Every structure is written in structure tokens, then in C-alpha cells.
A protein has these predicted regions:
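Short beta-strand/loop motif that positions the catalytic acidic residue
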Residues: 216, 221-224
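N-terminal cap/lid segment of alpha/beta-hydrolase-fold proteins
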Residues: 2-68, 117
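Short beta-strand element of the alpha/beta-hydrolase
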Residues: 70-79
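Primarily recognizes the serine-hydrolase "nucleophile elbow" in alpha/beta-hydrolase
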Residues: 126-215
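Acidic catalytic loop of the alpha/beta-hydrolase fold
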Residues: 200-201, 226-232
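Catalytic nucleophile-loop/oxyanion-hole region of alpha/beta-hydrolase
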Residues: 86-88, 108-139, 260-265
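C-terminal catalytic histidine-bearing segment of alpha/beta-hydrolase fold enzymes
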Residues: 235-281
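Short amphipathic alpha-helix adjacent to the substrate-entry channel of hydrolases
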Residues: 87-106
């Protein structure tokens, strides 16, 4: 179940060639077929990966129910150590809950190994640009967008916020990438949810205030359990961010391990926090 894949787009529908639909679930490729920024070469003969060599990252847009006034948008990335995306345990049930709390939700199926977290960060940025472009369609303020991720998905959100947000586009990684209409829109997110995750890389949180300050990071909400092998790192980074003056909040689940997904009753409090952050904007 953890390894189950989300449905892919049925046609060649992309965030560039398709109108946003505020009333129905939409599944859209994030990039045009011949214009995907990458530094990694993934060829047909490379097997044993979760995704096939010709995988195209995509976003699943799950809008609020009809008649609901949206409070903002949330972009979700599942965990899986860059070996898989646990959407059915992480992002899908969380998106379903956030939708009931009035948030437009967008699940990003970002690139995994053999790609890097830099390439995945561009996938996140692309989804944010699409939402900002269509803020009116989705009934939100273009600044009321949060990113969040579980484990590796949170590292992915962090990589985006640290190095690939605002005006950075695919050319930062790939000189052959041709910027398009969406790249004119800054990839700006106003909040981050780190669900048993941190700013850094797989298994290693970065505790250097000088490094972290380069990212001009938004308010950040941590959720983690005391039995998580990375518990001490979550605690330390939370304190570092707080001491830097970044707005931080957290839920610590006593006795909980790594990888609990949407369980633990944290989503409601996180939704309330997001609402407060968006009001400050």
C-alpha cells in the first residue's frame, strides 16, 4: 500500500497547456515533454528504480468542496527516502483532511533516485508557479501557499525553499532548459510543514544558522515523535530556527516513531496554524 502509485495524467495534460479546474480533481504533468530541466541522465537500460526511465513528474490537484471558501493552498510531498513516494500513507490522507479544513491541496509526484533533490525541488517550484498563476481560479490569495513534506518529501520542500524558490528556474540546473510563461511567476511559498523532516539532506539536518539564513525561510511547523531516530536533530533544528527569529511551531508526539503519515491527530492543529500564518501575510 505504501508503494502504491498515484494515477498519472491520462493525456498529455500539463500545467502549461491545461486550464485549472477549481471544481474537479486534475492530474497534470509538471513539464512539457521535451523541456524538463535535469542534470541526471536516466536511460532505458537503468532498471530497479521505483519510476521508469521516462517518468514525468506530475501534480494532483484536489480542490475544496463546492461552496467552501478556500483558506489557501498546500503543496504536499510524500516520504520514501527518494526510493519511493508513500502517497497513500502520507500525502493523500493528509490532503483529504486539509481539504475538509478548507485548503486547496496539490500532491506532487516529484522525481526520485537516480535524480537528485535539486531536480525534485524544481518540480515543487513548478507546482507552486501553477497555483500562483491560477490563484484567482482557486479562490485564494497568491501568497497563501504552503509547502510541506514527510521525511524525504520535507527535505524536498526544504531544498525548494533554500535554493529553488522565487525567481530561480530550470536554467539554474540545466542550461538547455528553455524558460516558459510559468517561469515568469515567482515560486513563492509562505509556510512550510516539516513532518518528521528538516532542512538539509537525507538523514542529515543542517544546523548552521548562516546556511539556513541564506534561504530566507518562511514560518515552519514541525511534527515528529519522540521515538524517531532523528528526534534529536528535529529538536536541535527547531531551536536553531527559533533562535534565528523564524516563526516556528511544533507538535511532538510522545512515543511515536518515524513515518506515521497523517496519523497522530496533528493535522487539525497544523491547519489552524496555517490559517494564522496566512492571515499575517
Amino acid at each position: 500500500y505504501m508503494l502504491k502509485k498515484m494515477p498519472e495524467p491520462e493525456q498529455n495534460d500539463t500545467v502549461l497547456n491545461t486550464d485549472a479546474d477549481p471544481d474537479n480533481i486534475q492530474v497534470l504533468y509538471l513539464w512539457e515533454e521535451e523541456n524538463v530541466p535535469a542534470k541526471t541522465t536516466f536511460t532505458k537500460d537503468m532498471t530497479g528504480y521505483f519510476d521508469d526511465w521516462d517518468f514525468r513528474p506530475y501534480v494532483t490537484a484536489i480542490p475544496v468542496r463546492k461552496g467552501v471558501t478556500p483558506k489557501g493552498a498546500v503543496v504536499l510531498m510524500a516520504g520514501g527516502a527518494y526510493q519511493f513516494r508513500g502517497n497513500y500513507t502520507d500525502s493523500l490522507p493528509t490532503a483529504a483532511a486539509l481539504r475538509e479544513y478548507g485548503f486547496q491541496t496539490f500532491i506532487v509526484d516529484y522525481r526520485l533516485s537516480p535524480y537528485t533533490q535539486e531536480e525534485g525541488a524544481l518540480d515543487v517550484a513548478r507546482a507552486v508557479r501553477f497555483i500562483r498563476k491560477n490563484a484567482d481560479v482557486y479562490g485564494i490569495d497568491p501568497d497563501d501557499i504552503a509547502v510541506m513534506g514527510f521525511s524525504a518529501g520535507g527535505i524536498q520542500a526544504g531544498e525548494f525553499l533554500m535554493h529553488y524558490d522565487e525567481d530561480v528556474n530550470g536554467t539554474a540546473l540545466d542550461s538547455s532548459y528553455v524558460p516558459d510563461e510559468l517561469d515568469q511567476i515567482p515560486a513563492h511559498a509562505s509556510a512550510d510543514g516539516m513532518i518528521y523532516s528538516f532542512y538539509g539532506r537525507l538523514s542529515v539536518g543542517n544546523m548552521d544558522p548562516d546556511w539556513l539564513s541564506e534561504g530566507d525561510l518562511p514560518p515552519t511547523f514541525y511534527v515528529y515523535g519522540t521515538e524517531d531516530p532523528f528526534y534529536d536533530q528535529f529538536e536541535e533544528q527547531y531551536d536553531v530556527l527559533k533562535n534565528m527569529g523564524i516563526q516556528t511551531s511544533r507538535i511532538v508526539l510522545s512515543g511515536w516513531p518515524h513515518g506515521f503519515g497523517s496519523d497522530g491527530g496533528w493535522v487539525k492543529q497544523y491547519a489552524e496554524w496555517l490559517e494564522e500564518i496566512f492571515k499575517q501575510e
